[in-house]
A protein has these predicted regions:
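Short helix-loop capping/hinge motifs at secondary-structure junctions, enriched
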Residues: 3-13, 30, 90-92, 103-110
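Residue-level preference for short coil/turn positions at secondary-structure junctions
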Residues: 18-19, 64-66, 81, 92-94
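Hydrophobic hinge/microswitch elements
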Residues: 27-84
Length: 124
């Protein structure tokens, strides 16, 4: 919530979350979030509340109404007018991939070729 005591901070540390309830998808839904959960469990001063695998407006509303803190991505920063997104001081990168048809168009094939070349990454 924009009214939360931490809302004006530029970055948050794990210690900033002490005494807070942290909303996150339930264990097993995301390997990255599971890694974050393992780190959070080392800090019993933080309570974990499981949410559904996919956040919907009800989850965002609950976060705002309860003044809880929620694990989210930067892309959700404008999803709710009463919530604010603040980066954490931790290194848990989120992997992204490309999903395309088994028999892609020439344009898609060219795009994939460029991505492979630029990122020096192998796609299977």
């Amino acid at each position: 919530s924009r009214e939360h005591p931490l809302a004006n901070k530029k970055r948050l540390s794990i210690e900033d979350l002490y005494g807070e309830t942290l909303m996150m998808v339930k264990e097993g839904d995301s390997t990255v979030v599971d890694s974050i959960r393992e780190e959070i469990r080392k800090h019993p001063q933080i309570t974990i509340e499981d949410t559904p695998q996919f956040y919907d407006i009800n989850v965002f509303n609950r976060c705002e109404q309860t003044q809880n803190i929620m694990i989210t991505l930067d892309c959700w920063k404008d999803v709710h007018p009463a919530l604010v997104t603040i980066p954490m001081d931790w290194d848990f990168p989120i992997p992204y991939g490309l999903l395309y048809a088994l028999n892609p168009s020439q344009d898609v094939e060219e795009f994939i070729r460029i991505v492979k070349k630029e990122n020096n990454t192998l796609f299977e």
